[in-house]
C-alpha cells in the first residue's frame, strides 16, 4: 500500500519566506502535482492534458529547517517518462548563470550508460527562475535558447533547451502575450 506524504504545520503570523526561497519553491512543487503540472504546461506551452506523468527525481525531506543548506537547490522532473526538466530558482546574481545552467543541462543530458544507443537520449530542458535580469541589453520575461546554425538559424537538435524566466519582468507580461502562448485544453 502506497502512503501519501502529508505535511502540515500550525502557523500563526506572517510567513517570512516567499516562493523565491529555494526551499519554499521546491516544497510547493513537491507537495502539489497540480502546481507542478500547471507550471510545466504553461512554460512549455503544453495543454495540461498532454502531461501524463511528472516525477520529481530528487525530492527534498519536507519539514527540515528552511535555513538548512544541505539539500540540492534544483528540482529534477521526469516528464511523461521521456523528457528531463531541471527547474532552479536563483535569487542572487552570481554572474555565472550561463555557465552554471549549461553545466546543469549537460550533466542531465549525459545519461547514457556504456553500450546504450545514442537514440535513447532523452530531451533535456533547464529552466531558471532568476530574480535579476540575465542580459540587461536583451530584457525578456521568458526566453528560450537552443543550438542552431548561426548563418541560417537551422536547429541542430531539439534535445537541449535552456529557458530563463526573469522574475524582475513579471509585471511587463501583458494579457495579450499570455493569450498568444495559451494552449487549448
Question: Which stretches of residues belong to each language-model region?
Answer:
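Accessory alpha/beta interaction modules
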Residues: 1-163, 168-173
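Single conserved hydrophobic/aromatic residue that forms the stacking wall/gate
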Residues: 177-185
Amino acid at each position: 500500500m502506497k502512503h501519501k506524504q502529508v505535511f502540515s504545520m500550525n502557523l500563526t503570523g506572517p510567513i517570512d519566506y516567499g516562493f523565491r526561497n529555494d526551499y519554499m519553491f521546491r516544497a510547493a512543487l513537491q507537495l502539489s502535482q497540480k502546481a507542478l503540472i500547471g507550471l510545466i504546461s504553461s512554460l512549455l506551452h503544453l495543454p495540461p492534458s498532454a502531461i501524463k506523468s511528472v516525477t520529481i527525481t530528487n525530492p527534498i525531506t519536507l519539514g527540515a529547517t528552511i535555513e538548512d543548506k544541505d539539500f540540492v537547490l534544483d528540482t529534477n522532473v521526469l516528464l511523461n517518462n521521456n523528457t528531463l526538466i531541471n527547474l532552479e530558482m536563483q535569487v542572487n546574481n552570481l554572474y555565472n548563470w550561463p555557465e552554471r545552467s549549461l553545466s546543469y543541462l549537460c550533466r542531465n543530458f549525459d545519461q547514457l550508460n556504456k553500450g546504450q544507443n545514442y537514440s535513447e537520449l532523452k530531451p533535456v530542458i533547464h529552466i531558471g527562475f532568476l530574480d535579476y535580469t540575465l542580459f540587461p541589453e536583451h530584457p525578456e520575461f521568458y526566453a528560450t535558447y537552443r543550438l542552431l546554425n548561426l548563418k541560417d538559424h537551422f536547429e541542430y537538435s531539439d534535445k537541449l533547451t535552456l529557458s530563463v524566466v526573469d522574475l524582475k519582468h513579471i509585471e511587463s507580461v501583458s494579457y495579450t502575450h499570455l493569450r498568444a502562448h495559451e494552449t487549448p485544453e
